Amino acid sequence: MQLIRQIPLLISVFWLSACAALVSVLIPLENVAKPTGEYQVGTQVIHMVDNDRSAWYGQESSNPREIMVRVWYPAQPQEGDLKAPYVYNEKLIGDMVSEGFGIPKYLMKNLRNINGNTWSEAHPVNEKFPVLIFSHGIGGLKTQNTTQMEEMASHGYVVFSCDHAYDAGVSIFPGDRIIFGKTNIPDNLTKEEKWNMRRAQLDYRAADIQFLLDEMDRENFLSVALKNSLDLEHIGVFGHSFGGGTSVVVASVDERIDACFGLDAWFLPIPSNVLNSDLNKPFIHLGQVSWKEKENYLKLDTLAGNNSAWSVRLDVRGATHYDFTDFSQFSKLTKKYGSGMIAPPRIRKITNSAIREFFDHYLKNGPALALETYEKLYPELIIKRY
């Protein structure tokens, strides 16, 4: 504990003495928490091309849409299988995170040392499991909620996540082709033009998820073994920030999706016709107590209030936007760069429990989410029923 209190002073000393590289030795990053389920977890990275859509609006629109997908699934590791890294291309990812959060780059050098709990290309368990699809926020990554991906796969789900190219912080394609995010809004646009731009991005994101769903029933990109492990009669979507809004939109238009979960979701870009319609699917939102944009949660309340299926809102005292990702899980220093006061193990437990029990009920016919029990177990929760 004494070292933790002295970290700001240590950083200043090392920085000023040009020995900043040593700080990464003094401040290691935590590994991904071990999942609690019965299954070991495999992972694969898949390059998919949608020839029916253009890459993005703008200069690249003449090329087909490409997305990089990562999948986590119940696995049977064999002798000789290797553990997968938390992220590939860790230096590039570390630099991107550093720039996005204002974190000194030398503090991200240990990103390569974060250990996950998955086996690369391990053979899938020979059973069928419900499918989940995750959507990241603006500037996010497909791996940003690896904690939840591994947890859900260990409990018998196949979890897909894609980099929404041009909207992700960075997408790395075969041949080391790199596409950085290009979705910043120009300052010279009117308010109406800005929201039209966001809705165009939202449409592309939702179409990415629908393309993923289409490909799960084909053999263009998925191995036969992985395809055979998919229970396509039970599908859920979840997402963080803009990805939460994306999940709502795609759930509202695609009958293949059975349930939807938002993690501190951004509702402002969602069209009014979606908010004012009946989602008619179970929906839960887990997020911070309030947003600076007060209208965000007003739109959440409109969506949930119009939903004829079960809806609930769980607000977490002491949490901020990035506590609902892996960001706060790897170092106490993240509290200096945007994570909240809630302890990392605590927000991890709340998030994992809510996601697992929600989808267990609606995709596996498990017990209903016991909100009265949640109120006792997690006094930091504010629960709103609709």
Which residues does each PLM region occupy?
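Primarily recognizes the serine-hydrolase "nucleophile elbow" in alpha/beta-hydrolase
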Residues: L212-S277
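Alpha/beta-hydrolase-fold serine-hydrolase catalytic core, especially in secreted/extracellular enzymes
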Residues: P28, A33-P35, Q40-G42, N51-D52, ...
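Active-site machinery of serine-nucleophile hydrolases
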Residues: W72-G80, P85-M96, G100-G102, T143-L189, ...
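The feature captures the conserved acid-bearing segment of alpha/beta-hydrolase catalytic domains
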Residues: D258-H321
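Short substrate-entry loop that stabilizes the transition state in hydrolases
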Residues: I114-F129, F134-I172, K292-K294
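Domain-level recognition of soluble alpha/beta enzyme cores
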Residues: V23-L132, P344, I355
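Alpha/beta-hydrolase active-site loop
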Residues: I172-S229
